[in-house]
Amino acid sequence: MMDKFRMIFQFLQSNQESFMNGICGIMALASAQMYSAFDFNCPCLPGYNAAYSAGILLAPPLVLFLLGLVMNNNVSMLAEEWKRPLGRRAKDPAVLRYMFCSMAQRALIAPVVWVAVTLLDGKCFLCAFCTAVPVSALGNGSLAPGLPAPELARLLARVPCPEIYDGDWLLAREVAVRYLRCISQALGWSFVLLTTLLAFVVRSVRPCFTQAAFLKSKYWSHYIDIERKLFDETCTEHAKAFAKVCIQQFFEAMNHDLELGHTHGTLATAPASAAAPTTPDGAEEEREKLRGITDQGTMNRLLTSWHKCKPPLRLGQEEPPLMGNGWAGGGPRPPRKEVATYFSKV
């Protein structure tokens, strides 16, 4: 069983786009299930029906949209790219727009499903517009002019509540309910049709007219995603090597002090030969992973430099040395060994 879960997890990791599409589909199904389980209670009061219905129609989609953005890991990447200092790498607004649109398209699926299900069900629309039913056309129009406007609004506001509705002498409740639900379902199917056409235009037609710009934005958004993953992986590898070498030096220095009978305070004066690891090949490999960054201050300057002044997107050319918060290691940079395969989830 664990092997199956491991295989599924590895598949999802290697297919980030399919994984995000699956998450969006699950959220869409969850939004429909949430609406079916939701207990809709119209207040049946003239001043509150519209506000209650608007809250039911708009608030849950907003929450679902924000949840869709939160569950997308690219939100932090987009914010980081948007707010980073310019440095030696220009920021392309087209790439930022592409990244945001890619996330927004997936995050909008669940809100669209909620709005469509709400309109097709008709309860929310019935509660919101029950006071706008044309009594003269659907009910006893001869009695309507004799009623004061507040009294007429009070009677019509109770149409969604069959247990308290007392205006059958003016307008049959079933007639008003069927009339409003018919309009609501027509709006619901129109909304589904419009969103489907809009999605078709965005996904299929737009790249045909702006193919070059679309390909550029897509490529560089994927590059930003992969660059961030590689940097995080390199930092993780460096942190592991740094911790391993630091712990080895501590244990070997402690062993040296115990052999000499020194106290705890002499750890800092242990000879450098005592800190040499017992396995030279393994130690050399760990030293190579450190890439010349062997102290906390240098690492902090490197991270600050990466944030403030990312390297230009120019390969095969000699880069000018970074000043201040740049490369602090002596001599040339050690060779890098980076062999990895990533699938972008943008």
Swiss-Prot record:
Effect of L67W: Decreases channel expression at the plasma membrane
Signal sequence, start to end: none
Compartment(s): Cell membrane; Endoplasmic reticulum membrane; Basolateral cell membrane
Tissue specificity: Predominantly expressed in adult brain. Detected also in retinoic acid-differentiated SH-SY5Y cells. Specifically expressed in circumvallate taste bud cells.
Region (Central pore), start-end ranges: 10-37
Membrane topology of this protein: Multi-pass membrane protein
Gene Ontology molecular functions: calcium-activated cation channel activity; identical protein binding; monoatomic cation channel activity; voltage-gated calcium channel activity; voltage-gated monoatomic ion channel activity
GO BP field: ATP export; ATP transport; monoatomic cation transport; protein heterooligomerization; protein homooligomerization; regulation of monoatomic ion transmembrane transport; sensory perception of bitter taste; sensory perception of sweet taste
Ranges for region Disordered: 313-346
Result, substituting W114A: Impairs the ability to activate the ERK1 and ERK2 cascade
A GO CC annotation given for this chain: endoplasmic reticulum membrane
Phenotype when changing Q10R: Decreases channel conductance. Decreases the inhibition of channel activity by ruthenium red
Record note on what altering N74A does: Has no effect on glycosylation
Record note on quaternary structure: Oligomerizes to form hexamers and octamers. Does not form gap junctions. Associates with CALHM3 as a pore-forming subunit in a hetero-hexameric channel complex.
Functional description taken from the UniProt entry: Pore-forming subunit of gustatory voltage-gated ion channels required for sensory perception of sweet, bitter and umami tastes. With CALHM3 forms a fast-activating voltage-gated ATP-release channel in type II taste bud cells, ATP acting as a neurotransmitter to activate afferent neural gustatory pathways. Acts both as a voltage-gated and calcium-activated ion channel: mediates neuronal excitability in response to membrane depolarization and low extracellular Ca(2+) concentration.
Protein name: Calcium homeostasis modulator protein 1
Organism: Homo sapiens (Human)
Gene from which the chain derives: CALHM1
